[in-house]
């Protein structure tokens, strides 16, 4: 299930931007330019996880 990504300030749907970042693997810089509102740009820059290779397990620090 895919949850929608919505800007909490203005209510704009940002799911298309997440698709372009994660599926099409576009650069964040190119996607952010398409949004004129600063609140949407901030949301995209801080709330979307970078693309990860999920086949590699992270090493755990036990200390």
Curated annotation (Swiss-Prot):
Assembly description: The DNA-dependent RNA polymerase used for intermediate and late genes expression consists of eight subunits 147 kDa, 133 kDa, 35 kDa, 30 kDa, 22 kDa, 19 kDa, 18 kDa and 7 kDa totalling more than 500 kDa in mass. The same holoenzyme, with the addition of the transcription-specificity factor RAP94, is used for early gene expression.
Biological processes per GO annotation: DNA-templated transcription
UniProtKB keywords: DNA-directed RNA polymerase, Early protein, Nucleotidyltransferase, Transcription, Transferase, Virion
Organism: Fowlpox virus (strain NVSL) (FPV)
Phylogenetic lineage: Viruses, Varidnaviria, Bamfordvirae, Nucleocytoviricota, Pokkesviricetes
UniProt-listed InterPro entries: RNA_pol_7kDa_chordopoxvir (IPR008448)
Gene for this chain: RPO7
Protein name as annotated: DNA-directed RNA polymerase 7 kDa subunit
KW Phosphoprotein (keyword) present: no
Domain of life: Viruses
Major localisation: virion
Keyword Transferase annotated: yes
